[in-house]
C-alpha cells in the first residue's frame, strides 16, 4: 500500500478519514519516494438520492510535507461504480492540485454542478479516488 495513516501505518487507514466532522488530528499520506500513489475509498452507503441537483458538496484537506523537495501534484476524483484500477467506473467530477507547496492544511470544498450531480445514478456506489504524483 502506498498510503499510510498519520502514524505511518497502513493498518486501519480508513479510520484516519472516516469522520463526519472534519478532524485534522488524523489523516492519510502518500508514502515518500513513490512516483504515483492511488487511494480509493467508498463513500458511506447510507447516502440517499436527495432528488435535487443542489448542494452536492465534496470536502477534503491536503498539504505537502515540505521536508521533501519534489513537486507533488494531487488529483481528486468522484467516481461511481469503481471496481478496480482496471474498472474505474464513471467519472463524475475531478480536480487537479498542481505543485502543492504549503505544509499548512488547505481545505477544499467543491460544489458539484447540476450536470455533475444529475449524472449520479447510484448514491450507494460513490467513491473518492485520490492520486498523488511526485514529479
Model-predicted segments: where are they?
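Predominantly extracellular/luminal cell-surface or secreted proteins
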Residues: 77-83, 131
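Short beta-strand-plus-loop segments that form exposed binding edges in beta-rich domains
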Residues: 129-135
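Short glycine/proline/serine/threonine-rich loop/turn segments at secondary-structure transition edges
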Residues: 49-53, 116-125
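Short beta-strands within extracellular/lumenal beta-sheet-rich domains
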Residues: 24-51, 108-112
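Flexible, small-residue-rich N-terminal segments that precede or flank a structured functional core
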Residues: 1-38, 94-101
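Beta-strand acidic-aromatic groove motif in beta-rich domains, primarily in extracellular
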Residues: 67-78
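Extracellular carbohydrate recognition and processing domains
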Residues: 88-118
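A short beta-strand element within beta-rich, extracytoplasmic domains
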Residues: 37-68, 128
Amino acid at each position: 500500500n502506498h498510503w499510510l495513516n498519520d502514524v505511518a501505518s497502513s493498518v486501519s487507514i480508513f479510520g484516519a478519514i472516516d469522520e463526519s466532522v472534519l478532524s485534522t488530528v488524523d489523516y492519510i499520506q502518500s508514502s515518500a519516494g513513490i512516483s504515483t500513489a492511488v487511494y480509493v475509498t467508498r463513500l458511506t452507503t447510507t447516502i440517499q438520492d436527495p432528488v435535487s441537483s443542489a448542494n452536492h458538496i465534496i470536502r477534503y484537506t491536503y498539504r505537502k510535507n515540505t521536508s521533501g523537495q519534489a513537486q507533488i501534484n494531487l488529483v481528486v476524483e468522484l467516481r461511481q461504480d469503481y471496481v478496480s484500477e482496471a474498472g474505474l467506473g464513471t467519472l463524475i467530477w475531478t480536480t487537479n492540485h498542481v505543485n502543492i507547496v504549503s505544509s499548512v492544511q488547505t481545505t477544499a470544498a467543491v460544489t458539484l454542478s447540476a450536470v455533475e450531480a444529475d449524472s449520479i445514478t447510484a448514491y450507494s456506489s460513490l467513491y473518492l479516488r485520490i492520486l498523488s504524483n511526485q514529479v
